């Protein structure tokens, strides 16, 4: 029998887009799904709208495994955690209610995950759709080969983090629920930045301990990320470089291993320097792309210009 895949969707005042997403999920090429929506204390009619869609859908298809839960507002992290407690699948994937996925999204993630028994998770590329500018671009459809797969798992993950952005979010991946439940992994509640990254890193550490130390890559842009629907809190959090620094510190702690040889430690330091440069550039781009006045943008960017140039020079050596 085909494995049951749990799909967790947090909803907060996004009823219309959630219904659009759910309608597409009922037409996925992979059918053995458990779809769990979690209303995170919506202040509009989202809960009722989605509930009615589910009721009507079940009248048409009695085998449809779709439900909606409700909780007081805790953010997407809290909503996902509640969803995880209710899952009964073998694998789990997360989708944001204002995003979209292509028809073979779940099937492709599953095939990639199960292709290699040692795979901890599978990850796909995505379409980055900028709603305000009405543009879109495909990302992460290329293979990454850093040569570290057989050397050191955490160094390999660090090299992926420093190479591009496919490993940071939870939304374009499929995870093993057995690993999550055994290690009691949750999303950190109350963070306004990089909670996804912390969840992924905690998961990968637990997966490594369970002898899952490979990553399955789906080289297709199957996840459609709609940029421009974020809340003001989410948008402003990426403007603060202190948030990027905290995330970097968390990654630095995660990658440490007392058993590392001097050679592996040196290798990790090299990739950490590259990652820090990447974070500085990503922060600068987030500020540059914002709608704030130029004078305010410079206030955020000015303290970073000289350190950025200095670090870039070091890495060239």
Question: Where are each of the predicted segments found?
Answer:
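Glycine-rich, basic loop-to-helix element that forms the pyrophosphate-binding segment
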Residues: 68-87, 108
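A conserved acidic beta->alpha catalytic loop
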Residues: 39-50
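Short, well-formed alpha-helical segments that are part of the catalytic scaffolds
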Residues: 13-27
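Conserved nucleotide-sugar donor-binding catalytic segment
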Residues: 153-237
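Flexible acidic/His/Gly-enriched loops in nucleotide-sugar-dependent glycosyltransferase catalytic domains
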Residues: 62-64, 102, 106-185
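Short aromatic/hydrophobic "clamp" motif used to bind/position activated sugar donors
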Residues: 92
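C-terminal subregions of glycosyltransferases and related glycan-biosynthesis enzymes
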Residues: 216-317
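Short beta-strand/loop segment that forms part of the nucleotide-sugar
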Residues: 32-41, 67-72, 96-97
């Amino acid at each position: 029998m085909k494995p049951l895949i749990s799909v967790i969707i947090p909803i907060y005042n996004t009823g219309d887009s959630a219904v659009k997403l759910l309608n597409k999920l009922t037409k996925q090429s992979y059918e053995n799904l458990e779809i769990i929506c979690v209303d995170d204390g919506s202040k509009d009619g989202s809960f009722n709208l989605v509930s009615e869609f589910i009721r009507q859908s079940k009248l048409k298809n009695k085998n449809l495994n779709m439900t909606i839960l409700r909780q007081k507002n805790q953010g997407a992290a809290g909503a996902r955690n509640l969803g995880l407690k209710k899952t009964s699948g073998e694998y789990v994937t997360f989708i944001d209610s204002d995003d979209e996925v292509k028809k073979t999204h779940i099937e492709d993630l599953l095939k990639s995950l199960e292709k290699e028994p040692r795979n901890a998770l599978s990850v796909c590329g995505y379409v980055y759709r900028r709603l305000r500018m009405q543009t879109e671009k495909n990302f992460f459809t290329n293979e990454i080969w850093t040569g570290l797969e057989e050397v050191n798992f955490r160094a390999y993950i660090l090299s992926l983090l420093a190479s591009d952005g496919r490993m940071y979010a939870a939304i374009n991946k499929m995870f093993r629920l057995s690993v999550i439940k055994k290690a009691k992994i949750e999303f950190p509640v109350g963070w306004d930045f990089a909670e996804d990254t912390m969840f992924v890193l905690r998961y990968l550490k637990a997966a490594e301990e369970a002898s899952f130390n490979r990553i399955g890559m789906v080289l297709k842009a199957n996840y459609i990320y709609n940029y421009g629907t974020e809340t003001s809190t989410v948008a402003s959090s990426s403007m603060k470089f202190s948030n990027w620094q905290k995330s970097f510190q968390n990654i630095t702690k995660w990658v440490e291993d007392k058993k590392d040889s001097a050679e592996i430690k040196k290798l990790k330091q090299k990739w950490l320097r590259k990652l820090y440069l990447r974070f500085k550039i990503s922060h600068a781009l987030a500020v540059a792309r914002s709608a704030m006045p130029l004078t305010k943008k410079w206030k955020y960017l000015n303290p970073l210009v000289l350190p950025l140039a200095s670090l870039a020079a070091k890495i060239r050596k």
